[in-house]
Every structure is written in structure tokens, then in C-alpha cells.
Amino acid sequence: MNIEKSNGKSLMTKINNLAKELGIENPQGVTIVRLEDTEDPNKKTLELVQGSWESKAPWFVIDKEEKVHVLSTLESILHLIRSLNEAKYENFNLKLEKAILENLPIDFNDVWVVAMSEIQKRLTESKNKNLLDIDIKKLVKDIKKHHPNLFMQLKDLQFPPQGHQ
């Protein structure tokens, strides 16, 4: 079966690249199947193009329009979703950390505790429970406004007077 089509780029090359992006160690050995129509509109057949029916790695399915789909186990998909959620949460924390540090906290941990408390308060009061919808920079500015004692003020820092070097 020839699967060397798809807009001048070989489907095999495309599938190998997708497999690499998915972290599959041996992309040349992945299972590839072609989805074929049958006379019965309620049934389709799968033709093994490469690999094995017993493969536990994601399968690549080529439809009649030469589009490539990935067939995977529910456990793998749930693991992927959990990983993405962890990455989003970590990214949120890094952005919060950066926003706090940009505002010159006297004690970072004190500001962090106030920020977490304010985030929980906002999430419980909001209909939208999405952590990512919180404007982090505005949150820290609000904390600085309501708790100025937690941050250094540039005017309070002693710099040598101008003209003396």
C-alpha cells in the first residue's frame, strides 16, 4: 500500500515526526493502519500498513482524505491531560512568582501567602473557577495597594544624591 502522499510531504515522514513529538522512541516502528470504507455504511475496515496489531503505543490511522489520526488508550489520554494540567499550574505559579518579585517584596513568602488567599477568595466568589483567568499582575498590584507594608518602596531606598559620584 502506498502512503507517500499528502501535499508533497510523505505521510510516513509526517507520521514519524508526529511520533517523535509524542515521545515515541522508535517512530519507524509505530503501528499505522488505513481506515477503509465497506459496502455497509455502518462498518469500516482497518488495514495494517506498518507495525503490529499488538502494539501498545498509539496507533496512527489514515483516513480516506489522507488525514492522520492518533488512536490511543484512555489511560494514556488521561495521563496526558494530567500532565498538561500540572504544567499549566506550574506555569501559573511561575508567573505569580515573577509578578511578586517585580514588585519588590520585603518578604516573598508573606506576599505569596496573601496572594494564595486572595486567589482562593476570588475563585470561590467567581462563577468561573478557572485559575488561568486571574490577571496575575493586577492581583499583585491590588495586594500592594491594600498591603503596602509587604513591599519595598523605591522612595524609601537611600540613593546617593545626584551630583556626588
UniProtKB/Swiss-Prot annotation:
A Pfam family this chain is assigned to: DUF2603
InterPro entries the UniProt entry points to: UPF0763
Highest taxon of the lineage: Bacteria
Family classification: Belongs to the UPF0763 family.
Name of the protein in its database record: UPF0763 protein NIS_0363
Source organism per UniProt: Nitratiruptor sp. (strain SB155-2)
